[in-house]
A protein has these predicted regions:
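Short, structured beta-strand/loop micro-motifs enriched in basic residues and often containing a Trp
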Residues: 70-78
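Bacterial N-terminal signal peptides that target proteins for export
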Residues: 1-9
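Short nucleic-acid-contacting surface segments enriched for D/E, G, S/T with interspersed K/R
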Residues: 77-94
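Conserved hydrophobic positions within beta-strands
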Residues: 36-40
Length: 131
């Protein structure tokens, strides 16, 4: 019986840690929306989150590489994304929310290509703001 209780306690603890890791509000600030234009330097097609890296040139002329968290590969595929959609050099307009820690990191809600095509890129977290 104590083995079952220990197992249950461990599962509850780990579930809480997993939820905290994937919580939008723990990592991103819904009061800090960002919109930026940049060129893709890399796309990591992975689960549980994909990552797009883009170079953004600021008003001061300095280029900063932003790390942009998306939904996972399976979710992106269901939304119409394909790996070949984002080769290096592709220009994108990205909308999302900045990381709470102030780094050039954001959770992406959508991207728009220069031809006007728009794709939803957000994670499926229920606590992420809806646009």
């Amino acid at each position: 019986m104590t083995g079952i209780l220990r197992t249950a306690a461990c599962m509850l603890l780990l579930a809480g840690l997993a939820y905290g890791h994937h919580s939008f509000t723990a990592e991103f600030d819904e009061h800090k929306p960002v919109k930026m234009t940049g060129k893709v330097t890399e796309m990591k097609w992975s689960n549980p989150h994909g990552w797009i890296y883009i170079d953004v040139t600021g008003p001061d002329g300095k280029t900063v590489n932003w790390a942009l968290e998306t939904g996972g590969a399976n979710a992106l595929y269901r939304r119409g994304w394909r790996k070949e959609d984002l080769p290096a050099g592709t220009v994108l307009v990205v909308e999302g929310w900045q990381a709470r820690n102030g780094t050039p990191t954001a959770n992406v809600s959508s991207i728009t290509f220069t031809n006007g095509k728009r794709l939803f890129a957000g994670s499926s977290n229920s606590d992420a703001p809806q646009q």
